Amino acid sequence: MKKRTIATFLALTMAVSLFAGCGQEAAPAASGDAPESQAEAAPEGETYKLLFGHTLTEQDPFHQAYLNWAEGVKEASDGRLIIEVYPNSQLGVEEDVLEQMKQGTNVGWQTDAARLGNYVNEFSVLLAPYFLESLDEVKQLMDSPTIGAWEDELAEKHNIKVLSFAYVQGYRNVFSNKKATNPAEMKGMQIRTAGAPIWVSGVGSLGCTPVSLPYGETYNGIQTKVVDGCELPYIAANNLKIQEVAKYALETQHFYQNNFIVCSVEWFNSLPEDLQKILIDECDKAGLAISEQMEKDTAAAKQEMVDAGVEVVPYEEMDIDAFKAASEKAYEELDLLDARDAIFAELGR
């Protein structure tokens, strides 16, 4: 199904749901373009369905994690709750999907703290430069009362329910055709990033000039010299074949990125309590499993890029103290100092 067709289908689904109620099953996708879920629907009236989308390719490890989540939910719910997984932005652009979600449609999405920060500013701190440092810290924060309060505000004011933030991509580094080891040397470098304020401010604090481009245009942007490089985790960079268009991997490790899985509060509340628990538990389970696997796979992705000719400037050779000092500007610009202090207190830092 082409993106336009699926987006139109979702709009119609949303309109129908206003009359039929969000707890009912959405119309199935056209048989010629089924989503990547092996789940079979239970008898009508006993099944709930979530259409889950993301921007990544079918080859991305997270996509397989979402298929695992779908299968785990199907098995644990005896087929009463079905998740259909749509990669490659097939459900539409993120802004449109989140808007449909806010209206109560049975859609879910992979997003990040930067995007959620547009609704509740404090979320942005989770993607601020040199903030989180490890998967263990993410696990520790899964029961955070501070983040729980932010989630409550997001749900009450914007009808967006956080199911999990256990999907960790790890450290992001700069991939560029220019070599640099400190903020001064990065000055003037045009680096592709996402458009949310914390991305722009955080990447800008490294000394370079952030340029917002869609994820799918990253490779072409570097190839055509629209930008000098990008900032990504090793696995994502390798999947996009950035080694074909960038000479250097600068190990800034400026962001430690975890992603959020969200859905509509209205739709979530339409589920029986046992299905709500299954949905969340299986989401966390699949997220932690892929996060642990990606920690192991990062070294292999890095080596593949090195074998293709990328020169690595290792973390130990970067002036990290200078980068960290410069990153304070991002916290101040986005009013995140109090949020940082609250989370650091919970982490014992």
Model feature map: region roles:
Residues M1-T5:
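Positively charged n-region of N-terminal signal peptides that target proteins for export
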Residues A7-M14:
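Sec-dependent N-terminal signal peptides
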Residues S17-G21:
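C-terminal motif of bacterial Sec signal peptides marking the signal peptidase cleavage site
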Residues G23-D33, A42-E137, T146, E153-R349:
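N-terminal secretory/targeting leader peptides
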Residues Q140:
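Short beta-strand-centered segments that line the small-molecule binding cleft or hinge
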